[in-house]
A protein has these predicted regions:
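Catalytic cores of nucleotide-sugar-dependent glycosyltransferases that transfer UDP/GDP/TDP-activated
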Residues: 1-505
Length: 505
């Protein structure tokens, strides 16, 4: 199959979150399965042009109001892909739209005021790029709201009777990475799309007199999915649907969840370059060394008998930090005061939470935190901790709980989203499970579940060791996820009555 990934981010070029990792990893693994994959992203100011190849001639993209936007196009080979199965990355270089600090906003402007124009142009330019390189995909795979207008252009412009017909056999798949971000702007921005106001309503842009880019993509794509099966079900109910639950119920027959994978070349205790000693489920000596190094790094007393609970997180409401660190009601103080454990945290985010956390570290001898992010330290926390705490309010997929399982670190999580699909709750009677789960997000439920894990550490140690080995045996490879995406692509082509050109390997 010919597959075109349309995204605002892809590592190592542009990243604000897990979207960037997913797009690159999925593309590389689809290519390994024998498919022809290309990625298109904007060339932001932060992307160094010196490592890119400039394609000849500027590219014109006609927009609404008689405007024609001109851009340069650069290309590069995706690092990590093989020479036998390369992945080409194309960069749309529009100096006014993308030649600035930040992807969606900067320190002065949380959300750039021209974001609807920036990413509407990007979505239209994708089709001009295909014409420029004379390559037309079987599948256009759009990711999150910045790419959501691409399926709209495909359905209402490029596949219509009046079009040139190059995309008549192209289908679209739309992936939701986080339903909380939808690209909602004033509808005055819509004229720039050049699609006509009848399409505004037909495509589903209309959202209480605003323009909702993600909603339009979800209405217009041929099939849609999200990044875990359980999150797909959750988003169809009002409490988790961010006002789009009705759309997702309407598209229910075409909506599914596919769990993200993880990169075992990076997150693997048998290969990890950031930990003091490699280890595996057959020889756990390296985990003990990592625990010792972690205690030293955070200035905690070296003690192999006391459990360490680790956290690597964004300090935002989505991650449950209010219930854990809220100054009047958070449970972190009580947990550290009442339980014989050590708690370490690496994170950055809301200012109030950073201040509260640093205050707690000065008052509690068994709680230590570092504000910021460090790749090396995040690996050490995953390897050296005994438990990993994720009290998320909602979690589309979640990666840290999967990293934890691979490292034999048992997750303590709320049963939401992808956490339900990846963690099996502990059974006191049989010792089965790979982690500890709670249903309702509250300070008391976090306290009780951490207490449950600490109780098991001191009173059911043989179960803890069995859970570790069971956790380390779980397979979260991207190859498995890639095969599920191929099945989704084939189902989409079949739905549209387009004959398959390549079989799944």
């Amino acid at each position: 199959l010919k597959i075109l990934m349309v995204s605002s981010e892809a590592v190592p070029y542009a990243k604000t979150g897990g979207l960037a990792d997913m797009v690159s990893s999925l593309s590389i693994n689809l290519a390994k399965l024998g498919h022809e994959v290309k990625i298109v992203i904007p060339r932001y100011y932060s992307v160094d042009r010196s490592g890119l190849k400039l394609l000849p001639d500027a590219m014109g993209t006609p927009m609404g109001g008689g405007i024609e936007e001109w851009s340069a196009v650069y290309t590069a080979d995706m690092p990590g892909a093989t020479k036998k199965n390369p992945v080409k990355v194309y960069f749309i270089d529009h100096e006014i739209f993308f030649g600035r600090d930040g992807i969606y906003g900067n320190a002065l402007e949380t959300d750039f005021i021209d974001n609807p124009r920036r990413f509407t142009f990007f979505c239209k330019a994708v089709f001009q790029l295909c014409r420029k390189i004379n390559w037309f995909p079987d599948v256009l795979h759009a990711h999150d709201w910045p790419a959501a207008v691409a399926p709209v252009y495909l359905k209402f412009a490029e596949r219509t009777a009046g079009s040139a017909g190059e995309f008549k056999d192209t289908v679209s798949v739309m992936t939701i990475h986080n339903l909380g971000y939808q690209g909602v702007y004033h509808k005055d921005n819509y004229d720039y799309a050049g699609l006509g106001w009848d399409v505004f309503y037909k495509a589903g842009f209309e959202d209480w007199s605003m323009m909702n880019m993600l909603k339009a993509g979800l209405y217009s794509c041929d099939k849609l999915n999200t990044v875990s099966p359980n999150y797909a079900e959750e988003t169809k109910i009002q409490v988790h649907g961010f006002r789009l639950d009705g759309v997702l119920r309407y598209r229910s027959a075409d909506y599914s969840g596919i769990l993200n994978g993880i990169d075992y070349n990076v997150w693997n205790p048998e290969k990890d370059k950031y930990i003091p000693q490699l280890y595996s489920s057959k020889n756990m000596e390296g985990k003990a060394k990592a625990k010792e190094a972690l205690q030293k790094e955070f200035g905690l007393p070296a003690n192999s008998k006391i459990p360490i609970i680790g956290m690597v997180t964004r300090l935002t409401d989505q991650k449950g930090v209010g219930e854990l660190f809220g100054p009047a009601y958070g449970s972190a103080w009580s947990i550290c005061r009442d339980m014989d454990l050590q708690l370490v945290l690496l994170g950055t985010g809301d200012t109030w939470c950073e201040i509260e956390i640093m205050g707690l570290t000065s008052r509690l001898s068994n709680f230590k935190a570092k504000i910021g992010y460090s790749e090396k330290l995040s690996h050490l926390i995953e390897a050296g901790s005994d438990f990993f705490l994720m009290p998320s309010r909602y979690e589309p997929c979640g990666l840290n709980q999967m990293y934890s399982l691979v490292y034999g670190t048992l997750p303590i999580v709320r049963s939401t989203g992808g956490l339900v699909d990846t963690v099996e709750n502990f059974n006191e009677k049989t010792g089965s499970g790979t982690g500890f789960m709670f249903d309702y997000l509250s300070p008391s439920s976090i306290y009780d579940t951490v207490g449950w894990a600490v109780w098991a550490w001191y009173n059911r140690r043989e179960y803890i060791e069995k859970m570790r080995k069971r956790a380390m045996a779980v397979n979260f490879s991207w190859e498995l996820s890639a095969k599920k995406y191929i099945k989704l692509y084939e189902e989409t082509l079949k739905k549209q009555g387009i004959k398959l050109k390549v079989n799944v390997q």
